[in-house]
């Protein structure tokens, strides 16, 4: 007892160094004590009106996966970091489908940006505002606050930068399909998930009103998901569980009218996954009564009907619906389009960067995540330059030894070469020099070298628009900036084939750590490195553990796990809030 009294006095006298959180568990009578230390809190928060810093200024646009991972790793002792985002929180977007049905609450998957900044001793400045324009010539960004206009002060401001990190994500791409913006729900933001949740309840409440015909009830309870990718499939699975585990118990009179349909333009859902997972998902959806319409393209959406074209027959079909969720396509934000025009990328669909995440056409601007794509160099475009650099004796032929000396740099600069060698089971450089009949060759001329590498570029793959890619890019860029001076004097990248010397940094290399597809009924599918595929109930528990561990803070980790436990015990809430 004396020890507890002493501890209480210590905590009370040093409140700036620790927090005490006491959580009483009603169901078990247990007591959990959680102490969060803050050894850095003695430092003063940097004020906005501080004297001008001699440090280079890095302006970060966005607080998604790319921006947040960058903020967590960048060396703030070397850079003056300033963040601009229209939302003052980071959202764990892979759990948005769970938010739509109340499996997880919205506040459980968000972490305030200022909490993240606080852990960096408060030396990062944040402004809740939207970027309107990037001026790469004068190195400024124009911003506007969306906070209540009735409050005093102006809303527009601009920031100068030495380095700009564009990590604003993407908006929905409707492919100019008529009626999509007016009548469809999307699933990109937390607010989208909350609107979907309210609409689902609206559909059920409207369907139990007296006097409606059976046809009207069926229409109201027909939920259509456009897009058979991971987001669409996971939402369909979550919705199915929500309906048949919770809602039919409180709306028993309309349980027979519920229908869930997934419309996919391709031949299979989850077509970016292993074929075994795609097949497993389709079979499970069939057992669950979820209709999967593959080979169909939506042509328009009206207030009560969705029109689609069946590719195999060319017929147009009109389908009544109660709610449509559009979960396909990645679009570019307006100010990013304007920026692309300024840097000569107006003909591209998405912002292009090089392998070091530098935006092409301008200097000191980097782009991460869904708003950009890495434009990889093709080997065949540089084949002559590579040959000349490797031919040290200027003999006009390339020996196996000469090629072996530059192969490591080639693989780093052109990762598709490594993929080609592995896929063709070519273990050594000499294997690549074999002629069409399989005979070994000690040397090749330029034409033979072109022939040897002619199929390499077919291995090039664009990076998927996932949280995993954006997070790795943010970490990579932060580490590059942290080691800027060191790598400028001692380059660590591959050799420059078009000039002398070496690149300062290694190019970004994405490491695929696997992907999950929750399929409802406490079953999931996973595709993990090493061609390992797992499906079933055990995979769902693996999904729980991985997603809990990937939360950005202990606070959100506790809240998410608590929501999962609450759902198991009490079910999902059906209140329209």
From Swiss-Prot:
**Gene assigned in the entry:** NDB1
Protein activity control = Activity is calcium-dependent with a more pronounced effect at higher pH.
- Domain EF-hand spans what residues? 378-413
Transit pept. (range): 1-35
Traced from the root, the source organism's taxonomic lineage reads: Eukaryota, Viridiplantae, Streptophyta, Embryophyta, Tracheophyta
Would the keyword Membrane turn up in this protein's UniProt record?
yes
According to UniProt, the reaction catalysed is: a quinone + NADH + H(+) = a quinol + NAD(+); a ubiquinone + NADH + H(+) = a ubiquinol + NAD(+)
- Binding of NAD(+) occurs at 221-257
The lineage's top-level taxon is Eukaryota
Its needed co-factors are: FAD
* Protein name per its UniProtKB record: External alternative NAD(P)H-ubiquinone oxidoreductase B1, mitochondrial
Gene3D superfamilies recorded: 3.50.50.100
Membrane topology value: Peripheral membrane protein
Q: Where does Ca(2+) bind?
A: 391, 393, 395, 397, 402
Please name the source species.
Solanum tuberosum
What does the sequence similarity comment in the record state about its family?
Answer: Belongs to the NADH dehydrogenase family.
């Amino acid at each position: 007892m004396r020890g507890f009294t002493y501890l209480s006095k210590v905590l009370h006298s040093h409140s700036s160094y620790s927090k005490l959180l006491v959580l009483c568990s009603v169901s078990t009578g247990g007591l959990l004590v959680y102490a969060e230390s803050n050894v850095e809190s003695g430092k003063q928060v940097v004020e906005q009106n501080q004297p001008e810093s001699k440090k280079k200024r890095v302006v970060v646009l966005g607080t998604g996966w790319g921006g947040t991972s960058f903020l967590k790793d960048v060396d703030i002792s070397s850079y003056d970091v300033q963040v601009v985002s229209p939302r003052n929180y980071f959202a764990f977007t892979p759990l948005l489908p769970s938010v739509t049905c109340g499996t997880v609450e919205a506040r459980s998957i968000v972490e305030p940006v200022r909490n993240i900044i606080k852990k960096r001793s408060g030396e990062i400045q944040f402004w809740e505002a939207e970027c309107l324009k990037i001026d790469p010539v004068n190195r400024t960004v124009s911003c506007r606050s969306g906070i209540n206009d009735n409050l005093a002060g102006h809303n527009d401001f601009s920031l100068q930068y030495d380095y700009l990190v564009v990590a604003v994500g993407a908006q929905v791409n409707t492919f100019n399909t008529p009626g999509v913006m007016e009548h469809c729900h999307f699933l990109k933001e937390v607010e989208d998930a909350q609107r979907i949740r309210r609409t689902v309840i609206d559909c059920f409440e409207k369907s139990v009103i007296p006097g409606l015909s059976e046809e009207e009830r069926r229409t109201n309870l027909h939920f259509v998901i456009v897009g058979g990718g991971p987001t669409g499939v996971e939402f369909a699975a979550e919705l199915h569980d929500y309906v048949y585990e919770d809602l039919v118990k409180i709306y028993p009179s309309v349980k027979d009218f519920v229908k869930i349909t997934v419309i996919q333009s391709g031949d299979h859902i989850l077509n970016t996954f292993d074929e075994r997972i795609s097949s497993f998902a389709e079979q499970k959806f069939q057992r669950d009564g979820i209709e999967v319409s593959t080979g169909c393209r939506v042509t328009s959406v009206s207030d009560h009907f969705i029109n689609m074209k069946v590719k195999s027959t060319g017929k147009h079909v009109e389908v009544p619906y109660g709610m449509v969720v559009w979960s396909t396509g990645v679009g570019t934000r307006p100010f990013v389009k304007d920026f692309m025009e300024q840097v000569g990328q107006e003909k591209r669909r998405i912002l292009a960067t090089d392998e070091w995440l530098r935006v092409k056409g301008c200097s000191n601007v980097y782009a991460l995540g869904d708003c950009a794509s890495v434009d990889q160099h093709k080997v065949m475009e540089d084949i002559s330059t590579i040959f000349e650099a490797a031919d040290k004796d200027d003999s006009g032929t390339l020996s196996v030894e000469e090629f072996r000396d530059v192969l490591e740099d080639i693989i780093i600069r052109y990762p598709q070469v490594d993929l080609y060698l592995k896929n063709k089971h070519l273990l050594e450089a000499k294997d690549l020099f074999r002629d069409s009949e399989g005979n070994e060759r000690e040397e090749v001329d330029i034409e033979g070298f072109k022939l040897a590498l002619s199929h390499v570029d077919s291995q090039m793959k664009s990076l998927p628009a996932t949280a995993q890619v954006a997070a790795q890019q943010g970490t990579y860029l932060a580490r590059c900036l942290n080691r800027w001076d060191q790598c400028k004097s001692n380059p660590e990248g591959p050799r420059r084939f078009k000039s002398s010397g070496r690149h300062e940094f290694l190019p970004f290399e994405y490491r695929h750590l696997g992907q999950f597809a929750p399929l409802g009924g406490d079953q999931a599918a996973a595709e993990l490195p090493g061609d390992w595929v797992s499906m079933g109930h055990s995979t769902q528990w693996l999904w729980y553990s991985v997603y809990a561990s990937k939360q950005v803070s202990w606070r959100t980790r506790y809240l998410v796990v608590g929501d999962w436990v609450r759902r198991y015990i009490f079910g999902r809430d059906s209140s329209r809030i």
